Amino acid sequence: MYKSKLYLMIIIMLTSHVEAADIMDVYNRSLNFNNDLKIITNDQKISQEVYSQTSSNIFPEVSITANTQEINVNKYTGTGTQKDYSTESASLTITQPLLRLYFFDELNKAESIVKKSKINLEEFKKDLIIKSAELYFNLINAKNSVAAGEVKLDSMLIKYESAKKLFDNGYISDIELNKYKNNYEMTMVEKQILVNEFDMVKQDVYIFTGREILDIHNLNHTIEIPLSTYDANSLISKALVSLDSIKSALLDVNISRDEMKSNKSKHYPTIDLNATYDYSDTSSGSRLGKQTRESNTIGLTINIPIYQGGFQKSKVTESRYKYKNAKINLDHLRRTVRKEILDNINNHNLLKSLVIVKRDRYDDVNQDYLTISHGADIGLYTDVEIKDAEYNLMVAKNDLIKSTLDLLLVDLNLKKYSSNLSVENIQTINRMLVW
């Protein structure tokens, strides 16, 4: 019987560990099941198909038309005789574009769209690294808040139960008792709010990964966090050249410029080479009798645009404004990136100091808790004071963990700007987690 219970406990513990997810589980799951990633991947494939469609415009267009007819002559007046007969014909047409100046501009535009889609895909995969960490950090903070809420609720329950005993013995009034009751009931509501917030974060993870999170790890608050230092000017200079969003914006400028050039080129003539081969076979019965005919033609088609109601001129003007907007967006993005880098560096420096302060605060509260715990063993402190000390310790611990997670998240963002962000970064954070 004892062995059976032991095995059951081991199975429960192992099951809990198997179902618990870490940051890498969230990230790997997102690579396979994140819907936004699937859409961006399909967009990248679509851009390749658009490029193939554009490049195919330079190749000849070949078509075959076949026709068969059976003619029934009901009445005929004229020389000779004519009976029912049939006609079979086929025509092979080849059209080879020779001069279309806009083709190369359209091809350059399609090529830039392919490059942009690849950059967007790689950028989104990097964003998945940061988003995985951010969602997991939110889970940790929400779960820690629920745990602290439970301790606070226990403390309020002890105070309320003590107040009821004091009221029964006539030491406090019903007004004071109601205060303890209201505090307890309010704490119950606060705890339920924390539980609801935890569930909402779980749903965010479900949307992100398509998987329910049953259990998670926590951050080892005693571990030393490696603190990086960033130079703002160096980071800004590097980001303005190598950041994926900057590269994508530069390609937007190229795309709009090629579109404008293509629209301008459509004012010019186009030249096509046309060749046809015709075959017809008419059975006997027609006025001219049975006959077979083969013929071929070859020629050039020149299309000179003269008047289109101002349509093409308007398209050129439209594309010119798009080109200007693309350059404006690029300039605005550069300004935004500069601001974001400076904000992140300032937050990074602030959070480094805050983590040190929170760690000192935790050490002080932990020392107070140990003192009260030891004093409670010899009757110096009540159960209420022990619970309050436990709650204060948990709050201090949660504050330290939250500040540390905020620091790690800002550090990931700064690594993205420096193009040093990789999966190894969240693997390092993963090793800081404990059960």
Predicted regions and their residues:
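Sec-dependent N-terminal signal peptides
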Residues: 5-15
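Small/polar, glycine/serine/threonine/aspartate-rich low-complexity segments that form flexible
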Residues: 65-96, 220-229, 261, 274-308, ...
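Surface positions of alpha-helical coiled-coils, especially the charged/polar e/g heptad sites
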Residues: 22, 29, 36, 99, ...
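Acidic, glycine-rich loop-and-beta core segments that form the ion-binding/anion-interacting portion
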Residues: 235-280
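Amphipathic alpha-helical coiled-coil segments
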Residues: 39-54, 124, 128-149, 158, ...
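Bacterial Sec-pathway N-terminal export signals of envelope proteins
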Residues: 19-63, 98, 173, 212-254, ...
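Periplasmic alpha-helical coiled-coil/stalk elements that build and connect Gram-negative outer-membrane
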Residues: 21, 25, 121, 127-238, ...
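A glycine-/polar-enriched beta->alpha junction
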Residues: 28-38, 45-60, 92-109, 119-126, ...
